[in-house]
Regions:
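Secondary-structure boundary/capping motif
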Residues: 14, 31, 44-53, 65
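Surface-exposed, flexible loop/turn segments at secondary-structure boundaries
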Residues: 20, 37, 57
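Short hydrophobic beta/alpha edge segments that flank linear recognition/processing sites
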Residues: 24-39, 61-70
Length: 70
């Protein structure tokens, strides 16, 4: 399993995947908003989305686990 973590502090603007989705490396999993910029969080490898640990509008901190891939 792979943990996809936030690289910065921000809020979850849009979730673009759901548990069970098959994703390829670099597919966008969700979009964070930080300092009026949109930052795409992408899959580090191909796999299946097992769990999404945040919801839209959540505030996340650097290093927080956002998505679990298997």
């Amino acid at each position: 399993m792979t943990e996809v973590k936030a690289e910065l502090v921000g809020s979850v603007w849009k979730i673009t995947s759901k548990p069970g989705d098959q994703v390829a490396e670099d597919d966008v999993l969700l979009i964070l908003e930080s300092m009026k910029m949109e930052i795409s969080v992408t899959a580090p490898r191909a796999g299946t989305v097992k769990e999404i640990r945040v919801k839209e509008t959540d505030v996340v901190k650097e290093g927080q686990v956002l998505v679990i891939l298997e």
